[in-house]
Amino acid sequence: MRLSAIVLALALTTAGAPAVAAETRPLRVMSLDQCGDQYALALAPGAALALSPRADDPDSWMREAAAGRRRVRPTLEAAVGFRPDVVVRYWGGDARLLARLEARGVRVVTLADATDFDGVRGNIRAAALALEAPGRGDALIARMDARLRQAAPATGAPKRSALYLTAGGFTAGPGTLVDAVLGAAGLANLVRAPGFAPVSVERIVLWRPARFVLSFFDQSRGDWRGPGRHPVVRRAAKGRVVARLPAASLTCPAWFAADAASMLKAAG
């Protein structure tokens, strides 16, 4: 009887071992693009992460946190090999990959193209829920809101107008997160047409905005011959640049867009 009891105890212990291992296994999170990388790194730093190849590029806000992390291409083969529990994406991954992931029961979080800070809050909550990190999500929203309070103009302060311009010669009007960033810092957007649009060198010369907010000029290898870098544009903007926002602050509809607003405020 004593031997039978020992055998039964060993059998129960062995049977329970895989279940315990499964419960303690780190969450496996795969990101399909650079924006997904930011959310995965911020909300699930303790997870087993498979990040996109662009996770540590100069225009990645969380590039330092990405150091030493696994990188994979956003392919079906990579997903099959990694076996993620959750996939985070903004635009990455083709229809075939997404269909196969969902068929396998993988949770796929698609970040919305947020055009204001309420939309960013929605992205954070959706990603935090899928990544089982609601507390981290709340902390991230609180951090963003604190930055927005820092950026907010004094009550009654007049709004100054400014033109947002990238090195590639693009600007942004209403219905974009850039417009929300300008507004959060108390700046009135000179562009009234919605969405993103190119701005010609000739128009800038004739228009001669009183203030410029420049962005994506820190990417020395990107758009190095773009209209925004034209000598005539440089002369038009001389002495009129409110701030130069780093590309990393505006590459993704995420919480660090509030840092861009705070930079504008700090630049005066």
Residue ranges of predicted features:
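Basic- and aromatic-lined ligand-binding clefts that recognize polyanionic substrates
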Residues: R25-L43, G135-A185
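Short beta-strand->loop
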Residues: R89-W91, T110-A114, L163-G175, P246
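A short, structured surface patch at a secondary-structure boundary
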Residues: R28-F82, V86-G92, A193
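Structured C-terminal subdomain patch of bacterial secreted/periplasmic proteins
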Residues: L27-R28, L32, D118-L129, D138, ...
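Boundary at the C-terminal end of the N-terminal hydrophobic targeting segment
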Residues: L8, A19-A22
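Alpha-helical, coiled-coil/dimerization segments enriched in small aliphatic residues
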Residues: P53-S60, A65-G68, T171-A197
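Flexible loop/hinge segments that line or gate small-molecule binding clefts
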Residues: L98-A126
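Bacterial N-terminal signal peptides
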Residues: S4-A15
